[in-house]
Amino acid sequence: MLPVQILKDNAQEERGESARLSSFVGAIAIGDLVKSTLGPKGMDKILISGNPESAGGIKVTNDGATILKSIGVDNPAAKVLVDMSMTQDHEVGDGTTSVTVLAAELLKEAEKLVNQRIHPQTIISGYRRALGIAQESLKKSSIESGDNIRDDLLKIARTTLGSKILSQHKEHFAQLAVDAVLRLKGSGNLDAIQIIKKLGGSMNESYLDEGFLLEKLPGMFQPRRVEKAKILIANTPMDTDKVKVFGSRVRVDGVAKVAELEAAEKLKMKEKVDKILAHNCNVFINRQLIYNYPEQLFADAKVMAIEHADFEGIERLALVLGGEIVSTFDSPQTAQFGSCDLIEEIMIGEDRLLRFSGVKLGEACSVVLRGATQQILDESERSLHDALCVLVTHVKESKTVAGAGASEILMSSAIAVEAQKVAGKEALAVEAFGRALAQLPTIICDNAGLDSAELVTRLRAEHANGRHNMGIDIEKGEVADVTKLGVIESYNVKLCMVSSAAEATEQILRVDDIIKAAPRARAQDNRPC
């Protein structure tokens, strides 16, 4: 029987072993790309965008999610790992590199098993069984924080920051992150924590401000300090709306007509300002521009008017101050005002900002980051954000596990023991899962320039003898009780890392056909030039 073409011309299809090999190669390449960034001694990557002269054109980072988000990936299996890393970053904030590397190692082991003629469904079944064993052993080893949650939060923050650019000042930033998270009082609302980056100074000059900072200033001749502020937050144009919206043109036959038009425009502006002042507010914050004439009217009324607050900033400001963003001013009685005890002007380096103190959302605060270059500030922000996410996750479920490779070897050892009880080819897949987990501490040692074979075998021996808190002391290059060194991690982060990697691997293993649709044909333009 002749083959029948069911796909359009130019559509591409890979089947069976070819499709599986393509998936393995793409996903493993992603893991190899980021594995050199893993651990406290991991290296950084320089990422250059298509236009390196643009703002943010060059990034220096070792954050797995940032690296994978910034590179263009064409392989579909590689895209699965990129999406998985993004999810890990969104859910728990840390472990983005670990989850990618673990998934790549699981696929390497799966590739070996496929080459031994073991069916992918058998591998998936073995991986599922191994995942259950790993999750159970991790749960048994976890410890509740109890009353000493602040100490645990500090240790977790130090561990998280230990592999970041902030590692040299991790004690300072750990205190800063924990103070910020504890102000949230368990709400987990990270929108209440604002991070402001200011060039200049050194990283250890960064600090936590207990007010909300806005990188804007009031208009000329307006109050620079307001107590007991009643704040109206708006997103409204302050010029003549219809002329701007409809792009109207006006033709006049004399200078007097121009003066009449300007007077009419001023009258419309004054009407809008009068409506705003009818709300009896003493502070007006607008997302859009406030022109010179309305600014003068606000100054005459002794009202602080702030213009051009960016959308994200004004959304967060409304949340923090307890107000709502309005766009019309016809019903003052329905407007929800923001409030705070004090608005004042402060200096950070050479820049002036406004600080809102005593805000309605009491847990709100601002972290001011200092640094020598924009790249340092950007990477510091990413690192601090990761730490804040991990701490918020831990506050919700206060369980910790040992870090520095201890948890991975614990799970690997538990899987190796249980694999002996599994019959058939599935046992090979269970053992392979354990070997993949053991690769994480191996890579951490390799990145630190240590003898990974020696250290990991010694670590296995310690765990076989029941000492499950033993991990790798990277600074001394030896096996040690890492809980005594304060190297602990959030149970949720580790659990999410193992589960996500196993699920992504299973999804890729199920693939036996890759179909690329034909490019969309452009309609031919027959119009004359």
From Swiss-Prot:
Gene Ontology biological-process entries: protein folding
Domain of life: Eukaryota
Disulfide bonds: none
Pfam family, one: Cpn60_TCP1
Keyword Phosphoprotein in record: no
Cell compartments where the protein resides: Cytoplasm
Broad class of where this protein is predominantly found: cytoplasm
CDD domains: TCP1_beta
InterPro entries per record: Chap_CCT_beta, Chaperone_TCP-1, Chaperonin_TCP-1_CS, Cpn60/GroEL/TCP-1, GroEL-like_apical_dom_sf, GROEL-like_equatorial_sf, TCP-1-like_intermed_sf, TCP-1_chaperonin
Recorded GO CC terms: chaperonin-containing T-complex
Keywords on record: ATP-binding, Chaperone, Cytoplasm, Nucleotide-binding
Signal peptide: none
GO molecular function: ATP binding; ATP hydrolysis activity; ATP-dependent protein folding chaperone; unfolded protein binding
PANTHER family the record matches: CHAPERONIN
Function: Molecular chaperone; assists the folding of proteins upon ATP hydrolysis. Known to play a role, in vitro, in the folding of actin and tubulin.
Subunit structure: Heterooligomeric complex of about 850 to 900 kDa that forms two stacked rings, 12 to 16 nm in diameter.
Recorded family membership: Belongs to the TCP-1 chaperonin family.
Protein name: T-complex protein 1 subunit beta
Organism expressing this protein natively: Caenorhabditis elegans
